[in-house]
Regions:
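Sec-dependent N-terminal signal peptides
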Residues: 3-15
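A cross-family detector of function-defining hotspots
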Residues: 33-142
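Short N-terminal segments immediately surrounding and downstream of signal-peptide cleavage
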Residues: 21-38
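Short, solvent-exposed mixed-charge patches
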Residues: 20, 149-150
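Residues at structural and domain junctions
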Residues: 5, 21, 89-90
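Sec/Tat signal peptide C-region and signal peptidase I cleavage site
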Residues: 15-21
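Generic cytosolic/nucleocytoplasmic N-terminal low-complexity/intrinsically disordered segments
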Residues: 1-2, 61
């Protein structure tokens, strides 16, 4: 399930970034809603169906990477796109909610139980690598999960 979710996440982000300008706002809204639902379902979050979110989108171009950010009460999910082809190369999930973090950590533990050779800070998915990092801000503590090229 976690591999399917991550594949869906990458595919959705890639498709959203390749949409034509007149279609982008509507498509991004649908894609973001799908990502929010998928991410919630992945960790067993019942609130995912009704979760409120907002989207920030800055297209790639002129040697500037593109960015799409989905903000919810539980997390901030950032997609970074290569400026040459607008393909998503990194996903950063900053978790704000203790419940969501607990559920996501449980998902990580299941992965590491099934893959005992991996260290406890990474999870592999195809040619991508999900890396765990601790960050903090003045108002709250985040745990970030970053998907990058291997």
């Amino acid at each position: 399930m976690k591999k399917l979710f991550l594949f869906t996440l990458m595919l959705t982000a890639a498709l959203a970034m390749q949409a034509q300008a007149s279609y982008i706002a509507e498509q991004l809204g649908r894609d973001a809603h799908h990502i929010v639902q998928s991410l919630g379902a992945c960790v067993g979050n019942e609130r995912a169906e009704s979760q409120q979110f907002d989207i920030t989108y800055m297209p790639a171009g002129n040697n500037v990477e593109g960015v799409m950010i989905i903000n919810t009460a539980d997390y901030r999910c950032t997609f970074k796109m290569d400026p040459r082809d607008e393909i998503c190369y990194e996903i950063i999930l900053d978790v704000r909610s203790a419940d969501f973090l607990r559920d996501f950590n449980r998902l990580f533990q299941v992965y590491h139980t099934e893959n005992p050779d991996s260290d406890d800070k990474t999870m592999h998915f195809g040619d991508k690598l999900i890396r765990v990092r601790e960050t903090s801000s003045t108002t709250s503590r985040f745990r970030s999960f970053t998907m990058t090229e291997k």
